Amino acid sequence: GLFGRVNYNYKQKYHASFTIRRDASSKFGKNVRWATFPSYAIGYTFSEEPFMDWARSVLDFGKIRVSYGKSGKQFDQPYISHGLLTVSSPFLGHPTVQPEWSQGLMNDKLTWEETKQFDLGLDLDFFQHEVNITVDYYHRLTDKLLYNITLPGNYSGYQRQWQNAYAIVNSGIEFMVKWDIIRKEKLTWNMSFNIARNWNRLKKSTNGMDFQNFNGVENFNNNLSVIGKALNGIYVYKDKGYYNSESEIPSYYLNGTRVYTYGSNIYQF
């Protein structure tokens, strides 16, 4: 891989940084193993401006940060894009060299899992830097996530294949306060408080399916992920309550005989 970075600082007020990476991995197919990952960041230290003189007795430092970047991740398994062959049984303690069958469908289009992230932050220092406040907002899109999907039908005897099949969005806010209660030469005591809130949702899934279970079993339990909704949501039938007596159950056989059901939910469809 290759790596480069350029930094710029003007009067300790205006800051800019540009970074670019060009990486390759033999884990991927030969036509998709190279990828470029740029990132950009700018900062504005507004506390150095003359118009902030009125607040200098309280505000020591104030800075706004904005950044955007793209990064890549390799999968752990080194050969799933190339396919694996199983050799025949050992002969006199040594495995033979004749391959017998493939352990799965190869996919030479498997490539990097990509993450694109936007960040907006604010840094504030008060009272001779005794109190520090940091606020951050982020929006992160993780695309081309690796998953062993179920193929339609029975393709060449194999029912599943590894693909770059999912995209997930995370966004959130982080807030932190740090307070130096005691700042002496031989004694330092500080406290910090932080709180964060994250929202996530499934951006897309295999074959555009609305419901997808990440455990590999589709639509067979209550734990599902729906496109546009939070991951791993719990979905159940909506009901009106419970029958309290037999007389409330409007169920009959074709011959007119009542069907007796005990303790059943009243479902809405």
In which residue ranges do the predicted regions lie?
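Alpha-helix N-cap recognition
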Residues: 245-246, 269
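Extracellular/periplasmic, surface-exposed regions of secreted and cell-surface proteins
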Residues: 1-238
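Core catalytic ATP-binding domain of two-component histidine kinases
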Residues: 246-249, 253
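Short, intrinsically disordered, charge-balanced linker/junction segments flanking boundaries
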Residues: 254-255, 261-269
